Structures are given as C-alpha cells and as structure tokens.
C-alpha cells in the first residue's frame, strides 16, 4: 500500500499533512514531481523526480499505481486513470474521486477547458481554507484506518 502524490501542484500544507501521517503510520509515501522536492528523512517517505515535460509525472504515477494504493491529486484525468486501475484518489480538499462521478467531472473539466480556449475568463478554485485542510486530514485518516 502506497500513497502517491502528484506533487508538482500539491499545496505545501497538504504535503506536510501527508508527511506527518506517513511518519505516524509507516505507510509508504511517494511524491512524484518534475522538480526537486525536499522530504523528511524517513525510510517510508521519498521523492521521485521525473524529467520535465507535459504529463511526465502523471504518466509515471499511472504506470506505478496499484489497486491498494491512494492517489493525492488535483488532476481529474489522472484520478480517472487511478480509479480505472482499482486505486482510490483524493483531491487536496479531501474530496474522494469515485467511479460513479469521474465521468461527469471529466466532462465538466473538458467544458471549462473549451471555455478558456475560446477566451472566456473562468475563475480558478479558491485558496485552501482551514476547513479544507481539516477535511483532507480527516479523509486521509479514514483511508489509513481502513488499511
């Protein structure tokens, strides 16, 4: 069982929550990014640096993830790939991606991409709030307790 983190865009506060949980439980935690990341010195926590390029980190995670694993990402297509392989996925706010809702989420993402490509200004997500951080930590603890 491994927690894979799409780390290029992962907020620092979420990385910190993940590291504390991994240190507490001993679960394997892997941050995948195309930049150098500093992680705590622990045998179960590591950073995997991949070459720069479009979706290189995502492709590496998709190649390695297993059905017993958890993915932490804000990337809906990557979450979809993880779910297809039987893994579970959470976003930074603690919302679980599910097989029942991923198709609708992909459709909405594609629609918003189309709007942006046509010049329509769309709002990005709001900054993470304290409630978001707590929701993420709560959902992570629930996942860890099931293991």
UniProtKB/Swiss-Prot annotation:
Signal peptide (from-to): none
Alphabetical list of InterPro entries matching this protein: UPF0178 (IPR003791)
UniProt similarity note: Belongs to the UPF0178 family.
HAMAP family in alphabetical order: UPF0178 (MF_00489)
Protein name (Swiss-Prot/TrEMBL): UPF0178 protein CV_1768
